[in-house]
Amino acid sequence: MNLNEFQQKYAYRKEINYDGQIDLLARVVMEQKERYILQTINGFKPAVVKGKMRHEAISREDYPAVGDWVVLQEKDFNDIVIIDQVLPRFSSIVRKVAGLRTDAQIVASNVTKVFIVISADEDLNERKLERYLTAVWESGASPHIVFSKVDLASDMDSIIEHADSIAFGIPLYKWNATNEEGKEDILANIHEDDSVVLIGSSGAGKSTLINALLTEKVLKTGSVREDDKRGRHTTTHRELFNLPTGGVIIDTPGMRELQLWTEDGDTLSHTFSDINHLIAECKFTDCKHDTEPDCAVKEALETGDLEEGRWNSYLKLQRELAYIERKQNAKLATEERKKWKKISMQQKKNR
């Protein structure tokens, strides 16, 4: 495989901006408990991170993730290559880790499009979709929505209508696994320089869709429990695949929950652009949308132009992001103190 073939096959983009030795460039295609499989110009290689990277890592974001482009050390260790550096990411799907810890988990990096896979055989959970869209817009990638199991939907037109009222022009696809109807529409929107990740709940059909797009069964698929419609986890790790039509696609384990993560204060602006527009029309710039006169938000709620459930969802996500930001700031301050304490102790040793 020459340089052009390697870069084209693994959706290398100019944003990566690497000008070093090409045989030291690799893309992470699989991650399992700090063990990695990389695609290099010379084929697949097992890998680990170098000790210095592990020692200096402050959070999980400092470790490689599926989709990352990495630079290798020149010498390997018993045929295991050593990851020396993670190149800057131009996008990343990030969520807060489950539980009380304020830590980020990278679902996939350097992706151009995110396909949110939703099962059409049950009622559309609008609040969950808003949460997914918020995470995708925050990532720097563009969101797409795929409705799976459309042959089992009781009212597909209603589902599309509801989704469109939230998605505001985001591409929507209908996918039928029994006859693969809709597959060509999806492939037509994945280009050779695209890196696409699929996210969604367990049992939504992500692995089945990837098998269809790859034209071969590379992923195990599972059934859905009839009592609660929850899928069984068939994908246990993240993995990147080449599409025969060009581009790469990343499978991810099903998500029971998606807790948001933020890097700035403008996270909700895309998902709730309608609410942002209303807020801009309020008489007072610091309107709390409570007792103030000439409040466009209150007026829209009263007339029904703004659904109360959507407004409450906006407020809930706003509170969640504010809480995470406060915790992040506290954590950063603690880490900064630890770092300088460590530097001070090292300086004393060197005297």
Swiss-Prot record:
It comes from Oceanobacillus iheyensis (strain DSM 14371 / CIP 107618 / JCM 11309 / KCTC 3954 / HTE831). Zn(2+) binds at C282, C287, H289, C295. Residues 100-258 form the CP-type G domain. Belongs to the TRAFAC class YlqF/YawG GTPase family. RsgA subfamily. GTP binds at S148, K149, V150, D151, G200, S201, S202, G203, A204, G205, K206, S207, T208. The keyword Cytoplasm applies. Monomer. Associates with 30S ribosomal subunit, binds 16S rRNA. This is Small ribosomal subunit biogenesis GTPase RsgA 1. Gene3D superfamilies: P-loop containing nucleotide triphosphate hydrolases, Probable gtpase engc, domain 3. One of several proteins that assist in the late maturation steps of the functional core of the 30S ribosomal subunit. Helps release RbfA from mature subunits. May play a role in the assembly of ribosomal proteins into the subunit. Circularly permuted GTPase that catalyzes slow GTP hydrolysis, GTPase activity is stimulated by the 30S ribosomal subunit. Binds 1 zinc ion per subunit. GO terms for biological process: ribosomal small subunit biogenesis. GO terms for cellular component: cytoplasm. Its cofactor is Zn(2+). CDD domains: YjeQ_EngC. It is found in: Cytoplasm. InterPro entries: G_CP_dom (IPR030378), P-loop_NTPase (IPR027417), Ribosome_biogen_GTPase_RsgA (IPR004881), RsgA_GTPase_dom (IPR010914). Keywords: Cytoplasm, GTP-binding, Hydrolase, Metal-binding, Nucleotide-binding, Ribosome biogenesis, RNA-binding, rRNA-binding, Zinc. Its EC number is 3.6.1.-. GO terms for molecular function: GTP binding; GTPase activity; metal ion binding; rRNA binding.
